Protein backbone atom coordinates (compact mmCIF):
# COMPACT_ATOMS: atom_id res chain seq x y z
CA UNK A 1 0.00 0.00 0.00
CA UNK A 2 2.84 2.44 0.78
CA UNK A 3 4.41 1.94 -2.61
CA UNK A 4 1.05 2.47 -4.30
CA UNK A 5 0.47 5.76 -2.51
CA UNK A 6 3.96 7.01 -3.38
CA UNK A 7 3.54 6.20 -7.05
CA UNK A 8 0.14 7.84 -7.27
CA UNK A 9 1.37 10.94 -5.48
CA UNK A 10 4.49 11.23 -7.60
CA UNK A 11 2.38 11.31 -10.75
CA UNK A 12 -0.18 13.77 -9.42
CA UNK A 13 1.50 16.09 -6.93
CA UNK A 14 2.37 18.59 -9.71
CA UNK A 15 -1.29 18.97 -10.64
CA UNK A 16 -2.50 22.53 -10.15
CA UNK A 17 -6.22 21.74 -10.37
CA UNK A 18 -7.66 22.16 -6.81
CA UNK A 19 -10.61 19.89 -7.65
CA UNK A 20 -8.27 17.05 -8.55
CA UNK A 21 -6.26 17.65 -5.38
CA UNK A 22 -9.41 17.46 -3.26
CA UNK A 23 -10.55 14.29 -5.00
CA UNK A 24 -7.13 12.72 -4.49
CA UNK A 25 -7.12 13.66 -0.79
CA UNK A 26 -10.61 12.24 -0.33
CA UNK A 27 -9.59 9.00 -2.01
CA UNK A 28 -6.54 8.63 0.22
CA UNK A 29 -8.61 9.28 3.36
CA UNK A 30 -11.04 6.59 2.27
CA UNK A 31 -8.19 4.11 1.82
CA UNK A 32 -6.73 4.93 5.24
CA UNK A 33 -10.13 4.67 6.91
CA UNK A 34 -10.86 1.33 5.27
CA UNK A 35 -7.47 0.00 6.32
CA UNK A 36 -8.02 1.13 9.90
CA UNK A 37 -11.45 -0.46 10.07
CA UNK A 38 -10.06 -3.71 8.71
CA UNK A 39 -7.30 -3.75 11.34
CA UNK A 40 -9.78 -3.13 14.15
CA UNK A 41 -12.22 -5.74 12.91
CA UNK A 42 -10.32 -8.75 14.22
CA UNK A 43 -12.16 -8.87 17.57
CA UNK A 44 -15.34 -10.94 17.28
CA UNK A 45 -17.91 -10.18 20.02
CA UNK A 46 -19.33 -13.68 19.56
CA UNK A 47 -16.00 -15.34 20.46
CA UNK A 48 -14.66 -15.86 23.98
CA UNK A 49 -10.88 -16.29 23.85
CA UNK A 50 -9.59 -18.42 26.72
CA UNK A 51 -6.00 -19.01 27.81
CA UNK A 52 -5.23 -22.51 29.11
CA UNK A 53 -2.20 -24.80 29.39
CA UNK A 54 -3.44 -27.90 27.62
CA UNK A 55 -0.91 -29.99 29.58
CA UNK A 56 -2.53 -30.17 33.03
CA UNK A 57 -4.73 -33.26 33.32
CA UNK A 58 -7.51 -33.67 34.23
CA UNK A 59 -8.25 -29.97 33.93
CA UNK A 60 -6.83 -29.00 30.53
CA UNK A 61 -5.13 -31.57 28.31
CA UNK A 62 -5.07 -33.24 24.90
CA UNK A 63 -7.49 -36.16 24.61
CA UNK A 64 -6.78 -39.37 22.69
CA UNK A 65 -8.27 -37.69 19.61
CA UNK A 66 -5.79 -34.81 19.91
CA UNK A 67 -8.48 -32.34 20.90
CA UNK A 68 -8.35 -30.15 23.98
CA UNK A 69 -10.46 -31.51 26.82
CA UNK A 70 -10.66 -31.60 30.61
CA UNK A 71 -12.69 -30.30 33.52
CA UNK A 72 -11.78 -26.64 33.06
CA UNK A 73 -12.22 -26.92 29.31
CA UNK A 74 -15.73 -28.36 29.61
CA UNK A 75 -16.80 -25.91 32.31
CA UNK A 76 -15.73 -22.86 30.32
CA UNK A 77 -17.35 -24.29 27.18
CA UNK A 78 -20.60 -24.61 29.16
CA UNK A 79 -20.15 -21.00 30.30
CA UNK A 80 -19.65 -19.97 26.68
CA UNK A 81 -22.89 -21.72 25.72
CA UNK A 82 -24.77 -19.77 28.39
CA UNK A 83 -23.24 -16.53 27.11
CA UNK A 84 -24.00 -17.38 23.48
CA UNK A 85 -20.30 -17.24 22.61
CA UNK A 86 -18.01 -19.66 20.80
CA UNK A 87 -15.02 -20.52 22.98
CA UNK A 88 -11.62 -20.29 21.30
CA UNK A 89 -8.68 -21.67 23.29
CA UNK A 90 -5.18 -20.20 23.24
CA UNK A 91 -2.74 -22.77 24.66
CA UNK A 92 -0.15 -21.01 26.80
CA UNK A 93 2.47 -22.20 29.33
CA UNK A 94 1.39 -21.47 32.89
CA UNK A 95 4.23 -19.08 33.67
CA UNK A 96 3.21 -16.92 30.68
CA UNK A 97 -0.54 -17.18 31.08
CA UNK A 98 -1.17 -14.00 33.09
CA UNK A 99 1.10 -12.00 30.79
CA UNK A 100 -1.07 -13.25 27.93
CA UNK A 101 -4.20 -12.10 29.74
CA UNK A 102 -2.74 -8.67 30.48
CA UNK A 103 -1.60 -8.20 26.87
CA UNK A 104 -5.13 -9.11 25.67
CA UNK A 105 -4.12 -12.26 23.80
CA UNK A 106 -7.24 -13.73 25.36
CA UNK A 107 -10.16 -12.61 27.53
CA UNK A 108 -10.09 -15.17 30.31
CA UNK A 109 -7.82 -17.74 31.98
CA UNK A 110 -9.30 -21.21 32.59
CA UNK A 111 -6.54 -23.19 34.25
CA UNK A 112 -7.27 -23.84 37.94
CA UNK A 113 -6.37 -20.33 39.05
CA UNK A 114 -6.21 -20.55 42.84
CA UNK A 115 -7.91 -17.65 44.58
CA UNK A 116 -5.56 -15.68 46.84
CA UNK A 117 -5.19 -12.09 48.02
CA UNK A 118 -2.53 -11.17 45.46
CA UNK A 119 -4.58 -12.38 42.49
CA UNK A 120 -7.80 -10.89 43.84
CA UNK A 121 -6.07 -7.50 44.00
CA UNK A 122 -4.66 -7.76 40.48
CA UNK A 123 -7.35 -9.58 38.48
CA UNK A 124 -11.11 -9.97 38.26
CA UNK A 125 -11.80 -13.48 39.56
CA UNK A 126 -15.03 -15.38 39.06
CA UNK A 127 -16.94 -17.31 41.68
CA UNK A 128 -14.98 -20.52 42.44
CA UNK A 129 -15.85 -23.63 40.43
CA UNK A 130 -13.41 -26.05 42.13
CA UNK A 131 -12.47 -26.81 45.72
CA UNK A 132 -9.35 -28.88 46.35
CA UNK A 133 -6.58 -29.60 48.84
CA UNK A 134 -2.82 -29.29 48.56
CA UNK A 135 -0.65 -32.39 48.86
CA UNK A 136 3.09 -33.07 49.00
CA UNK A 137 4.38 -35.72 46.60
CA UNK A 138 7.70 -37.51 47.13
CA UNK A 139 9.41 -40.62 45.84
CA UNK A 140 7.87 -43.76 47.28
CA UNK A 141 11.04 -44.61 49.20
CA UNK A 142 11.32 -41.19 50.85
CA UNK A 143 10.10 -41.26 54.45
CA UNK A 144 11.70 -37.97 55.49
CA UNK A 145 8.69 -35.83 54.56
CA UNK A 146 5.60 -36.31 56.71
CA UNK A 147 4.33 -32.73 56.84
CA UNK A 148 4.71 -29.25 55.40
CA UNK A 149 7.41 -28.29 57.90
CA UNK A 150 9.64 -31.06 56.53
CA UNK A 151 10.02 -29.14 53.25
CA UNK A 152 12.30 -26.65 54.99
CA UNK A 153 15.68 -26.87 53.28
CA UNK A 154 14.40 -29.30 50.65
CA UNK A 155 14.08 -28.68 46.89
CA UNK A 156 10.63 -28.73 45.29
CA UNK A 157 9.80 -28.76 41.58
CA UNK A 158 7.10 -26.15 40.93
CA UNK A 159 5.75 -23.85 38.24
CA UNK A 160 7.40 -20.61 39.32
CA UNK A 161 4.27 -18.45 39.37
CA UNK A 162 1.87 -21.04 40.76
CA UNK A 163 0.15 -20.92 44.13
CA UNK A 164 1.87 -24.21 45.01
CA UNK A 165 5.27 -22.62 44.46
CA UNK A 166 4.40 -20.05 47.12
CA UNK A 167 3.27 -22.80 49.50
CA UNK A 168 6.63 -24.54 49.04
CA UNK A 169 8.75 -21.40 49.47
CA UNK A 170 6.73 -20.29 52.50
CA UNK A 171 7.61 -23.66 54.05
CA UNK A 172 11.30 -22.94 53.50
CA UNK A 173 11.85 -25.01 50.37
CA UNK A 174 14.03 -24.06 47.43
CA UNK A 175 12.04 -24.09 44.18
CA UNK A 176 13.28 -25.68 40.97
CA UNK A 177 11.19 -24.05 38.24
CA UNK A 178 9.35 -26.37 35.84
CA UNK A 179 6.73 -25.90 33.14
CA UNK A 180 4.13 -28.14 34.75
CA UNK A 181 3.21 -31.11 36.92
CA UNK A 182 4.45 -33.81 34.53
CA UNK A 183 7.92 -32.27 34.40
CA UNK A 184 7.90 -31.94 38.20
CA UNK A 185 7.23 -35.67 38.55
CA UNK A 186 10.04 -36.46 36.11
CA UNK A 187 12.55 -34.43 38.13
CA UNK A 188 11.29 -36.06 41.32
CA UNK A 189 11.71 -39.58 39.97
CA UNK A 190 15.15 -38.72 38.61
CA UNK A 191 16.25 -37.64 42.08
CA UNK A 192 16.86 -34.03 41.09
CA UNK A 193 14.32 -32.69 43.61
CA UNK A 194 12.93 -33.90 46.92
CA UNK A 195 9.24 -33.19 46.44
CA UNK A 196 6.53 -31.32 44.58
CA UNK A 197 3.42 -29.66 45.97
CA UNK A 198 0.24 -29.76 43.94
CA UNK A 199 -3.49 -30.22 43.82
CA UNK A 200 -4.84 -33.51 45.21
CA UNK A 201 -7.13 -33.81 42.18
CA UNK A 202 -4.24 -33.55 39.70
CA UNK A 203 -2.14 -36.05 41.66
CA UNK A 204 -5.04 -38.52 41.89
CA UNK A 205 -5.58 -38.27 38.13
CA UNK A 206 -1.88 -38.86 37.47
CA UNK A 207 -1.68 -42.00 39.62
CA UNK A 208 -4.96 -43.32 38.21
CA UNK A 209 -3.84 -42.94 34.61
CA UNK A 210 -0.22 -44.02 34.97
CA UNK A 211 -0.33 -46.51 37.84
CA UNK A 212 3.01 -45.01 38.88
CA UNK A 213 4.15 -46.65 42.13
CA UNK A 214 7.42 -44.72 42.19
CA UNK A 215 5.83 -41.69 43.83
CA UNK A 216 3.40 -41.19 46.69
CA UNK A 217 1.41 -38.56 48.54
CA UNK A 218 3.61 -38.10 51.58
CA UNK A 219 1.49 -35.49 53.35
CA UNK A 220 -1.18 -32.85 53.00
CA UNK A 221 -0.40 -29.16 53.19
CA UNK A 222 -3.31 -28.62 55.55
CA UNK A 223 -4.95 -26.00 53.36
CA UNK A 224 -8.04 -26.09 51.18
CA UNK A 225 -8.04 -23.91 48.07
CA UNK A 226 -10.64 -22.66 45.64
CA UNK A 227 -10.12 -22.10 41.92
CA UNK A 228 -11.71 -19.52 39.64
CA UNK A 229 -11.58 -18.05 36.15
CA UNK A 230 -9.49 -14.87 35.81
CA UNK A 231 -10.18 -11.80 33.67
CA UNK A 232 -8.53 -8.39 33.52
CA UNK A 233 -9.32 -6.09 36.44
CA UNK A 234 -12.44 -4.05 35.78
CA UNK A 235 -13.66 -6.24 32.91
CA UNK A 236 -17.46 -6.58 33.06
CA UNK A 237 -17.09 -10.01 31.44
CA UNK A 238 -16.55 -11.56 34.87
CA UNK A 239 -20.10 -10.62 35.93
CA UNK A 240 -21.49 -12.48 32.92
CA UNK A 241 -19.26 -15.46 33.73
CA UNK A 242 -20.53 -15.50 37.32
CA UNK A 243 -24.14 -15.42 36.14
CA UNK A 244 -23.44 -18.34 33.81
CA UNK A 245 -21.72 -20.31 36.61
CA UNK A 246 -24.74 -19.74 38.86
CA UNK A 247 -27.01 -21.15 36.17
CA UNK A 248 -24.71 -24.14 35.61
CA UNK A 249 -24.64 -24.83 39.34
CA UNK A 250 -28.42 -24.56 39.61
CA UNK A 251 -29.20 -26.82 36.64
CA UNK A 252 -26.71 -29.51 37.73
CA UNK A 253 -24.29 -29.07 34.83
CA UNK A 254 -21.29 -28.26 37.06
CA UNK A 255 -21.91 -31.31 39.23
CA UNK A 256 -22.28 -33.51 36.14
CA UNK A 257 -18.97 -32.37 34.63
CA UNK A 258 -17.28 -32.80 38.00
CA UNK A 259 -18.60 -36.35 38.44
CA UNK A 260 -17.31 -37.20 34.96
CA UNK A 261 -13.72 -36.29 35.83
CA UNK A 262 -13.48 -36.92 39.58
CA UNK A 263 -16.29 -39.26 40.55
CA UNK A 264 -17.54 -36.64 43.00
CA UNK A 265 -18.71 -33.03 43.02
CA UNK A 266 -15.69 -30.76 43.53
CA UNK A 267 -17.50 -27.64 42.33
CA UNK A 268 -18.87 -26.71 45.77
Region spans (language model):
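Extracytoplasmic small-molecule ligand-binding "clamshell" domains
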Residues: 44-112
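Extended ligand-binding regions for polar small-molecule ligands
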Residues: 41, 73-82, 142, 162-163, ...
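Short helix-initiation/N-cap motifs at beta->coil->alpha
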Residues: 73, 89-101, 143, 161-162, ...
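Acidic, polar ligand-binding/catalytic clefts
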Residues: 77, 86-150
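Short loop->beta-strand "edge-of-pocket" segments that line small-molecule binding or catalytic clefts
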Residues: 49-52, 148-161
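Alpha-to-beta junction loops
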Residues: 84-86, 103-111, 154-155, 190-202, ...
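C-terminal motif of bacterial Sec signal peptides marking the signal peptidase cleavage site
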Residues: 35-39
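Periplasmic-binding protein-like
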Residues: 131-138, 204-246, 264-268
Amino acid sequence: MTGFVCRVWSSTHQERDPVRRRLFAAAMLAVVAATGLSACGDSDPNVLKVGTEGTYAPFSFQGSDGKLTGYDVEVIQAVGDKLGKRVEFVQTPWDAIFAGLESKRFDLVANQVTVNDERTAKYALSAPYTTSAGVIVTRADNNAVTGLADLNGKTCAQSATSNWSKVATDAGAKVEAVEGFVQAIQLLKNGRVDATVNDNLAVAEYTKKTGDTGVKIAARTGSVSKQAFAARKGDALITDVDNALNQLRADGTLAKISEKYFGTDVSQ
